[in-house]
Amino acid sequence: MKAPVRVAVTGAAGQIGYALLFRIASGAMLGADQPVILQLLEIPDEKAQKALKGVMMELEDCAFPLLHSMIATGDPAVAFKDADVALLVGARPRGPGMERKDLLTANGQIFTVQGEAIGKYANPNVKVLVVGNPANTNAYIAMKSAMKHGRVKAKNFTAMLRLDHNRALSQLATKTGKPVASFKKVAVWGNHSPTMYPDVRFATADGAKVPELLKLGTAEGDAWNKDTFIPTVGKRGAAIIEARGLSSAASAASAAVDHIRDWWLGTNGEWVTMGIPSDGSYDIPEGIMYGFPVTCKNGEYEIVKGLEIDAFSREKMNNTLKELNEEKDAVASML
């Protein structure tokens, strides 16, 4: 049996946490032969800690062979100690009358503290995924806060755009009648927000070119892409809140499992989307936490290079970049 991997999860008793922990403990994230130690962080509030104990009781009752042990804590220093993987799920949700700037400030405080703790206490090779929204900027804050301690590199911090990627796949499958697993080379650029740009220009399905299946280049095909597909993917979260009365939790948890699994185990040359600190590719300024098409191998991700960016795509990519720059400026004083 392999040595157990330490997985820290924040917001562990929340809706996404509840949907996520059983998947991790079952082996769906790191593999069917990889034991895990769950290091679970919740706010140091009696009610939240009690709820977390209840979740842990359920995890015990599943008798997962791969669940080595669990820790519950309200202290980030304990939760991130020697963590090999960290899923930052807990975030301040947007309340009534809250401006986006207020949301950025409230979350800035949370992710500064957690980033600092990761920088001080986690395994220096920790793989960090920020799920809590606004995910890209929360990841940027955590990254900057951690890097002050000189142990954890920028590249270890990522933001979740996999849910948007999976949503794009699902919409394409519905539109074309092809199985969702047949789609390759789909990308989502930019911010995890309605400004994101799902890009199908290079996509294939069972070897067929998706732009041809969608009749891109004709008035009808281009209208579907611009007026239906892109906004549907971008606003899917809001549509789920409208239908369910709650934000998407199980699908977000599933995307988080996909993101870490692919980063950990590799993608066999397939493209996936990850929010990562830009290396300057595609004229996206270095250090901005931005969604790119990547491939993963040996625990590292690499941006898919050399893709042609047409005028429509450049406009979309710049629009989402502008929003990310505005968010970055809004939190600059906290860093």
Swiss-Prot record:
NAD(+) binds at G11, A12, A13, G14, Q15, I16, G17, N107, Q114, V131, G132, N133. One of its GO terms (biological process) is malate metabolic process. Its EC number is 1.1.1.37. It is an enzyme of class 1 (oxidoreductase). Substrate binds at R94, R100, N133, R167. Keywords: NAD, Oxidoreductase, Tricarboxylic acid cycle. It comes from the Bacteria. SUPFAM superfamilies: LDH C-terminal domain-like, NAD(P)-binding Rossmann-fold domains. It catalyses: (S)-malate + NAD(+) = oxaloacetate + NADH + H(+). The active site is at H192 (proton acceptor). One of its GO terms (molecular function) is L-malate dehydrogenase (NAD+) activity. Belongs to the LDH/MDH superfamily. MDH type 2 family. NCBIfam families: MalateDH-SF1, PRK05442.1. Catalyzes the reversible oxidation of malate to oxaloacetate. This is Malate dehydrogenase. It comes from Bdellovibrio bacteriovorus (strain ATCC 15356 / DSM 50701 / NCIMB 9529 / HD100). The gene is mdh.
